[in-house]
């Protein structure tokens, strides 16, 4: 994996691994052996069906009198097939766990800090799989530094509904309604561009230069 994705040289040997690369390799190996693999072995009602898989879906919406589409896509870290035929989309994270949210509305209407991009991302991936593969999908976040805790769960925890581990179809109607409304506003020429109120949110935003916060 290191040869293919980092060095881009399948003929490289261990002698070519130096400095920071060796450190990262050791950290990743420790996360896998100490967290991901033991967790998966203890929760084995699934089969891995895809790794680093490109997914995409053209989402239809209406802006004024125009019928438009927005293409959502990305690379899903891992896709599992669960025993009942549903899919699970897994996103690996290295930070502190953030699995709780106050319903899908909070992902669209909260402040920058309340808009949990990790949860929104996995729900978008679940939406893509639902529409392109015709089955339900369960979003999951693997926070690898915390997976050795006995109480760890990668399932999203919806505090508004009091539900943990809900699949996409539970949210589909409301999630897509909010997504369409957000896109319609973005494409409405009558709505002026507004910078995020919380400037701290912009520190790691890829678009901060465009909106003059860079």
Language-model features: locations:
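A general structural signal for stabilizing positions within well-ordered secondary structure
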Residues: 40-42, 70, 196
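Non-catalytic protein-protein interaction segments used by genome-maintenance enzymes to assemble
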Residues: 50-132
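Secondary-structure capping and boundary motifs in well-ordered enzyme cores
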Residues: 1-2, 20, 24-28, 68-72, ...
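Residue-level signal for beta-strand positions within conserved beta-sheet cores that form or flank
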Residues: 44-47, 85, 135-137
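Short acidic (Asp/Glu) and glycine-rich catalytic loops that position anionic groups and cofactors
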Residues: 4-15, 94-107, 145-163
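A non-catalytic, helix-rich entry segment at domain boundaries
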Residues: 1-60
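Metal-dependent nuclease catalytic regions and adjoining charged, substrate-binding loops involved
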Residues: 6, 114-119, 124-214
């Amino acid at each position: 994996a290191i040869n293919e994705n980092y060095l881009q040289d399948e003929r490289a040997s261990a002698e070519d691994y130096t400095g920071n690369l060796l450190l990262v390799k050791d950290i990743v190996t420790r996360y896998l052996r100490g967290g991901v693999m033991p967790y998966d072995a203890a929760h084995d009602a699934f089969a891995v069906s895809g790794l680093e898989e490109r997914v995409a879906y053209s989402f239809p919406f209406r802006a004024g009198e125009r019928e438009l589409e927005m293409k959502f896509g990305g690379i899903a870290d891992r896709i599992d097939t669960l025993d009942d035929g549903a899919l699970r989309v897994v996103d690996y994270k290295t930070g502190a766990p953030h699995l709780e949210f106050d319903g899908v509305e909070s992902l669209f209407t909260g402040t920058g800090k309340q808009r949990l991009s990790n949860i929104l991302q996995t729900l978008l991936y679940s939406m893509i799989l639902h529409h392109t593969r015709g089955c339900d999908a369960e979003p999951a976040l693997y926070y690898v530094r915390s997976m050795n805790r006995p109480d760890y769960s990668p399932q999203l925890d919806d505090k508004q509904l009091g539900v943990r581990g809900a699949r996409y179809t539970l949210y589909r109607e409301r999630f897509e309604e909010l997504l369409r409304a957000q896109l319609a506003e973005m494409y409405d020429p009558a709505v002026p561009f507004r910078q995020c109120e919380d400037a701290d949110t912009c520190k790691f935003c890829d678009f901060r230069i465009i909106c003059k916060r860079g």
